[in-house]
């Protein structure tokens, strides 16, 4: 199936030329191109048009989950009939394993997995292995982290066809091999149940059940059904069932891996003993031996990813498999906000290695743990055969890689001009700002301030609140979901002013903002570099009255570059508008575009309606004396019920309540171990 672009708009301004140049470059096999597009010029729409014309599977790489979600939503809108998937880290919380030798502190791995994102990740890999060409995967830097071997994943795909002869028990065993779990009582994602000749499979990568009906040893019917109502959604003549987990292996591979691990353990223990590290040798022997027993008995152990090289059959030092391996040979990578994303890709390997060196040197892990890692930057470059870098401020690396192939997109479809930039002295800057804020409030417009420190952002917020200005701040200490809510509140008018440090830059789509104030603009550094100033100024480019005020006592090179480049673009935009009789139009954009439909607004509602914490809202189950007299089956049922309550509370963002259920769960599990082992 080919890509089918759906949009009420047609390419205008610089877009038609940009689309043509980028498309020609990709079709001619040009390895790297750069799209230099100003804020609000429709870069996403341009890329969507390129994808539709080249008809290749495409990876869109963004530097954080929030922007990835925004892009996913936009591409879903452009390609409703095609496979647009989302692949980011599925951890709601992740504390990596680490050892701090200075204080002799071992930090155990701790995590919480988001079930919904896990489903979306599986949907992405399943779409890529389906053989479709019309696949767009929007991803964060997670795409370069290790995952299962795609060939092992594909070997466990179950193909069924109506009318084919297939023993039902053989089919059930194949489901188990694909890591589906039988559960005839409570069917959840990744489970299946059997009722007579009917097998219901809750697919791990969709929200639907697959119902397979047998007539003896013949497949009589295949249909997707609604898991709640049981109503048939669609019948099928044939169907591919993809595995329930990204990490697949076989019994033979597991046994071979255990033998290799034990051989390497013997060598590493002997090495530690030869250099006088008897304690490390003993620690390593005990930990790895315990892990091997767990794998033999249960098929997994805590930290099994550190043995991934053995299960994948890779040689020492070779790169891990990652999402890029699931793409066909001929695919396109689009790196959004490349001036930030590329350095992030480059840094991942070094950070991971620095943490694991201590774990290996002090006997917590085998050296093979070093091979459970993200790609090195050089490995990523080798796999990225065709790349389009997208940025309003591309860095030197992108320009060198593109070898001069830079496609400029300066004209906005709305006719909006780059904002006017004024430089004002820092003396009495707050009084000056108060006057500017009042002017914007009268017009029902919004204001962004950017400061150099979190403390300054908080103190400025307090000052403005004391002067009856509706405002709030966002910085790295404010969690992601709360940031989304605050920015949405700004658009709604709950706040007139938003103050931040480094979060008011790439990708924030706030058309109501007509003024951006940059405090301490002359303090050269990361936050006041040419690229940072240009990106920050761009936040005012989506408003017809857009204006930027830089408060500074001297003109720095970064300020001069930003002002000169902005003026050059304004001249080009003005000339185009005059030549084509275009009057700038204010952008009007719907709020709350989200990965999960209206999840952002639902989350915001849940946040505002959260229960006040006064006392535990449910009785302490583990403290109930009746628990001591429960049978094993009753205890297991109680544990499962508590786990579900915890997950439901977390889904509703009732985190205090979820934490209470978590504590109950741990107590019940401890009681279970005490009584039955």
Pin down the residues of each PLM region.
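Conserved RecA-like helicase motor-core motifs
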Residues: 80-89, 303, 446-448, 460-482
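Conserved helicase ATPase core of P-loop NTP-dependent helicases/translocases
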Residues: 478-501
């Amino acid at each position: 199936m080919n890509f089918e672009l759906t949009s009420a708009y047609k390419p205008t301004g610089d877009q038609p030329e940009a689309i043509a140049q980028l498309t020609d470059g990709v079709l001619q096999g040009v390895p790297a191109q750069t799209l230099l597009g100003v804020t609000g010029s429709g870069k996403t729409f341009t890329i969507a048009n390129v994808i539709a014309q080249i008809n290749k599977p495409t990876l869109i790489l963004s530097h954080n989950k929030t922007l990835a979600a925004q892009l996913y939503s936009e591409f879903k809108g452009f390609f409703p009939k095609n496979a647009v998937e989302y692949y980011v880290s599925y951890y709601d919380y992740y504390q990596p394993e680490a050892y701090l030798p200075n204080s002799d502190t071992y930090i155990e791995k701790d995590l919480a997995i988001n079930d919904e994102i896990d489903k979306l990740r599986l949907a992405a890999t399943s779409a890529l292995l389906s053989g479709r060409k019309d696949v767009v995967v929007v991803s964060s830097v997670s795409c370069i982290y290790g995952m299962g071997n795609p060939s092992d994943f594909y070997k466990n795909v179950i193909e069924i066809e109506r009318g084919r002869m297939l023993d039902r028990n053989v089919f059930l065993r194949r489901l188990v091999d694909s890591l589906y779990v039988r559960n005839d009582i409570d069917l959840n994602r990744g489970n299946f149940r059997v009722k007579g000749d009917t097998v219901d499979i809750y697919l791990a990568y969709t929200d639907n059940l697959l119902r397979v009906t047998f007539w003896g040893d013949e497949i009589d019917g295949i249909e997707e059904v609604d898991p709640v109502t049981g109503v048939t959604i669609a019948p099928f003549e044939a169907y591919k069932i993809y595995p329930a987990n990204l990490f697949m292996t076989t019994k033979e591979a597991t046994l071979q891996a255990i033998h290799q691990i034990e051989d390497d353990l013997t060598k590493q223990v002997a090495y530690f003993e030869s250099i006088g590290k008897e304690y490390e040798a003993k620690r390593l022997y005990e930990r790895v031996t315990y892990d091997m027993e767990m794998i033999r008995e249960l098929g997994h152990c805590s930290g099994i990813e550190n043995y991934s090289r053995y299960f994948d059959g890779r040689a020492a030092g070779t790169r891990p498999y990652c999402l890029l391996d699931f793409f066909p040979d001929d695919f396109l990578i689009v790196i959004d906000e490349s001036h930030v994303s590329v350095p992030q890709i480059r840094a991942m390997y070094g950070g991971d290695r620095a943490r694991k060196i201590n774990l290996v040197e002090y006997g917590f892990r085998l050296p093979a743990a070093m091979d459970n890692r993200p790609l090195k930057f050089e490995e990523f470059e080798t796999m990225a055969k065709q790349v389009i870098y997208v940025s309003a401020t591309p860095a030197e690396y992108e320009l060198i890689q593109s070898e001069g192939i830079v496609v400029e997109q300066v004209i906005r479809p709305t006719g909006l001009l780059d904002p006017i930039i004024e430089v004002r002295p820092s003396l009495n800057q707050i009084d000056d700002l108060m006057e500017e804020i009042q002017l914007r409030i009268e017009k029902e417009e919004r204001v962004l301030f950017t400061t150099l420190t979190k403390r300054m952002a908080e103190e400025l917020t307090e000052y403005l609140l004391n002067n009856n200005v509706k405002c709030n701040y966002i910085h790295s200490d404010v969690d992601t979901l709360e940031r989304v809510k605050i920015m949405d509140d700004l658009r709604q008018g709950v706040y007139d002013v938003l103050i931040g440090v480094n979060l008011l830059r790439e990708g924030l789509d706030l058309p109501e903002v007509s003024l951006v104030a940059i405090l301490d603009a002359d303090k050269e550094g990361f936050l006041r570099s040419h690229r940072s100033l240009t990106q920050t100024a761009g936040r005012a480019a989506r408003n017809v009255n857009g204006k930027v005020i830089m408060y500074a006592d001297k003109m720095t090179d970064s300020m001069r570059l930003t002002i000169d480049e902005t003026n050059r673009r304004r001249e080009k935009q003005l000339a185009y508008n005059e030549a084509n009789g275009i009057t700038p139009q204010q952008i009007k954009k719907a709020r709350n575009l989200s990965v999960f439909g209206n999840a952002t607004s639902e989350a915001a509602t849940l946040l505002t309606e959260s229960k006040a914490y006064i006392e535990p809202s449910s009785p302490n189950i583990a403290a109930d004396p009746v628990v001591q007299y429960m049978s094993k089956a009753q205890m297991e049922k109680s544990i499962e019920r508590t786990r579900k309550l915890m997950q439901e509370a977390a889904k509703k963002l009732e985190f205090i309540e979820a934490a209470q259920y978590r504590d109950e769960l741990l107590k019940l599990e401890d009681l279970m171990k005490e009584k039955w082992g």
